[in-house]
């Protein structure tokens, strides 16, 4: 019987700033990116907040962290700190 090789997609890695660290083992990370406006061609800063799993409560507000996609940990957490 032949073994099938599954091709796995690499998980997305983002860099952002911790904006909230009030919950246990959870931080909120804001990721900023620059995009060009389709009509006006102006560079615009877009931001998105991600709820991230922080196993050892290491990070505080203002820290710069890298986060990686993960299987769902809770209803809103789908990212972990690298």
Curated annotation (Swiss-Prot):
Q: Does the keyword Electron transport apply?
A: no
Quote the Pfam families the UniProt record gives.
Answer: Ribosomal_S17
Q: Name one GO molecular function term.
A: structural constituent of ribosome
SUPFAM superfamilies reported for this sequence: Nucleic acid-binding proteins (SSF50249)
- Name a biological process GO annotation: translation
Cellular component annotations (GO), alphabetically ordered: cytosolic small ribosomal subunit
InterPro entries attached to this UniProt entry: NA-bd_OB-fold, Ribosomal_uS17, Ribosomal_uS17_bact/chlr
Reading the lineage from the top rank, the first entry is Bacteria
Sorted alphabetically, the keyword list is: Ribonucleoprotein, Ribosomal protein, RNA-binding, rRNA-binding
* Assembly: Part of the 30S ribosomal subunit.
PANTHER family linked to this entry: 40S RIBOSOMAL PROTEIN S11 FAMILY MEMBER, SMALL RIBOSOMAL SUBUNIT PROTEIN US17M
The protein's role, per its UniProt record = One of the primary rRNA binding proteins, it binds specifically to the 5'-end of 16S ribosomal RNA.
Q: Would you identify the family this protein belongs to, as annotated?
A: Belongs to the universal ribosomal protein uS17 family.
**NCBIfam families assigned to the protein according to its UniProt record, in alphabetical order:** PRK05610.1 (NF004123), uS17_bact (TIGR03635)
This protein's name: Small ribosomal subunit protein uS17
What gene is behind this protein? rpsQ
